[in-house]
A protein has these predicted regions:
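NTP-dependent small-molecule kinase module
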Residues: 1-2, 18, 22, 26, ...
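Hydrophobic anchor at the beta1->P-loop junction of P-loop NTPases
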Residues: 8
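Conserved glycine(s) of the Walker
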Residues: 15
Length: 166
């Protein structure tokens, strides 16, 4: 692995945390999830949005990403972390893996989550994803389409592509 930090980006619910944990285990490195870091320090994301608003959440997210990428390992970001230009520039020192999807399986993945930006469910998810997709694509060193493969095969593809990027 050429760069010491692998950062997983992509839309909410695509599997960044699930794949990230397994990837970190396979690479024998630490795993950090920026959403979990925010929750541990500041409380539930939904409550942060309700009490402090999205701009404050995004500021907390910038801090979490900066902290997470300061040490070697695998990092899963929140879906909107890439909205920050500061975060975008910081990701330049990492290997960015974009987990893409066509959205066909997202309804079941999103059904069991409390996501403050998805008041209208899958329609909101699609709109947000289309808005962010160009940013995900521009930041990616590696793109993995998760639509037609299992998490295990996506993980194998990431490991193979990371080895090729060395």
């Amino acid at each position: 692995m050429g760069k010491d930090v692998v950062v997983l980006i992509g839309p909410m619910g695509v599997g960044k945390t699930t794949i990230g944990k397994k990837l970190a285990r396979a690479l024998k490195v630490e795993f950090r999830d920026t959403d979990a870091m925010i929750v541990a320090e500041h409380g539930a994301i939904g409550e942060i949005f309700a009490k402090l608003g999205e701009p404050e959440f995004r500021r907390l997210e910038e801090v979490a990403v900066a902290s997470a990428i300061s040490e070697p390992g695998v990092v899963a970001t929140g879906g909107g972390a890439v909205l920050s230009e500061l975060t975008q520039s910081r990701l330049g020192s990492t290997t960015v893996v974009y987990l893409s999807t066509d959205g066909r399986h997202m309804a079941s993945r999103l059904a069991n989550g409390n996501r403050p930006l998805l008041q209208n469910g899958l329609d909101d998810w699609r709109r947000i994803y289309e808005e962010r997709k160009p940013t995900y694509e521009s930041l990616a060193d590696i793109t993995i389409n998760t639509s037609n493969q299992t998490m295990a095969s996506a993980l194998d593809e990431i490991k193979t592509r990371l080895t090729k990027n060395d």
